[in-house]
Amino acid sequence: MTQLLLFLVALLVLGHVPSGRSEFKRCWKGQGACQTYCTRQETYMHLCPDASLCCLSYALKPPPVPKHEYE
């Protein structure tokens, strides 16, 4: 009985397969993450090479470029 329990525990531990996206691809100088969807706390910056979205936290988002008025 003990061996059966040990065998089942070993199967559960060794059989665990992490998801394919456990390591997010990085973008935007390593500060963003390539994801399918951005969360509410993130903003979309550009497309990653695999056509996913580069999501960047609002706290890390660069300030907008000031618009110069042309005469």
Swiss-Prot record:
GO biological process: defense response to bacterium; innate immune response
Keyword terms of this UniProt record: Antibiotic, Antimicrobial, Defensin, Disulfide bond, Secreted, Signal
Residues in the signal sequence: 1-22
Compartments where located: Secreted
GO cellular component terms attached to this protein's record: extracellular region
Disulfide-bonded cysteines: C27-C54, C34-C48, C38-C55
Main location: secreted
Protein family per UniProt: Belongs to the beta-defensin family.
Function: Has antibacterial activity.
Name of this protein: Beta-defensin 124
